[in-house]
């Protein structure tokens, strides 16, 4: 029984270690945006999404690359976070019913949020969800696939979180050979390079650690 328990403990530790070093948890590209007040504030209080931060994410006029940096600064937490749920509730409360033909007395649902989200809004939702629930790789990957079915934009900021999710899933499956190709493709193939070069440098520094594995395939 002791040996069985020890084996289980070792397996759990190995899984936790793999999640601790993944594309979602080990790419702190927010550091390239610390001159932006909203990102700096999030970095100073990680694992918390302020009302100001929620409003920033919700505002479609704000640039997606800064939104991603904000979410990245909030960071992941192995014990779980409430930030995704809190942001969804914010979206529900501030959803423009008239714009989307929803009756004033009808309660907005999470389905309404996703149904009417733009591709950039989907990118922020996917990334925030992934950083909250990164240990649930199946759900995270499924949400990413849904986002990729929306009308896409050929922007680096949209593709970045998708690539991080794909690479994270590969890491969870111990498929090390697909980590570098996934990140390299999703990050570097878009024509619109709207992420800061330093942010991409941070992400690719992580990806390059796995490049030798890709070369073996």
Task: Annotate each language-model stretch with its function.
Residues 64, 119, 124-126:
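Start-of-helix signal in alpha-solenoid helical-repeat scaffolds, especially tetratricopeptide repeats
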Residues 69-73, 124-131, 159-164, 205-209:
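"A position-specific structural signal for the A-helix of alpha-solenoid helical repeats
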